[in-house]
Amino acid sequence: MKTAHEIRPGNVIMLDGSPWVVQKTETTRSGRNAAIVKLKLKNLLLNSGTETTFKGEDKLEDIILDRLDCTYSYFADPMFVFMDAEYNQYDVEAENLGDAAAYIVDGMEETCQVTFYDGKAISVEMPTTIVREVIYTEPSARGDTSGKVMKPATITGGGTVTVADFVKVGDKIEIDTRTGEFKKRV
């Protein structure tokens, strides 16, 4: 058990019978009152989010989930199948992947972290950055160079990313999977 003000982003807490990962914490202290801790949480079973508030001294049950490095194997509707180094396969429901599903492609070489709760694979964490090919984007607009010009691009896997104007079809780009932002052309 930890007090609310000891909880940090990345911790997993048990709340209302479900595991929640802490995405953001904000502590507010006022003169005579005790600290108030505001937590932004994501439910690992339902892939939904919420914000909630606790008193600083409230006790929260922190849990440690098993995580395993795996590679993407194949898609069997509605499951994404991942494989570990010992060739064990783990099914993760497509709805539990959230935004990560747009970055998963056949033949990807990046290693993902599969999270387990009660022996069941419940979520997948992508690497911080990945490289994908642009399969569609509009041509750059000539003369439109005032400031930072951005445009939408479709990448392998079907996701859409806002890229710099100089990026064209066939370019490989680096993407931050936490924010979905274009980092650079590779």
UniProtKB/Swiss-Prot annotation:
Pathway: Protein biosynthesis; polypeptide chain elongation. One of its GO terms (biological process) is peptide biosynthetic process. The keyword tRNA processing does not apply. GO terms for molecular function: translation elongation factor activity. It holds the Pfam family EFP_N. InterPro entries: Elong-fact-P_C, NA-bd_OB-fold, Rib_uL2_dom2, Transl_elong_fac_P/YeiP, Transl_elong_KOW-like, Transl_elong_P/YeiP_cen, Transl_elongation_fac_P, Translation_prot_SH3-like_sf. It comes from the Bacteria. SUPFAM superfamilies: Nucleic acid-binding proteins (SSF50249), Translation proteins SH3-like domain (SSF50104). GO terms for cellular component: cytoplasm. Involved in peptide bond synthesis. Stimulates efficient translation and peptide-bond synthesis on native or reconstituted 70S ribosomes in vitro. Probably functions indirectly by altering the affinity of the ribosome for aminoacyl-tRNA, thus increasing their reactivity as acceptors for peptidyl transferase. HAMAP family: EF_P. Belongs to the elongation factor P family. This is Elongation factor P. It comes from Shewanella baltica (strain OS185).
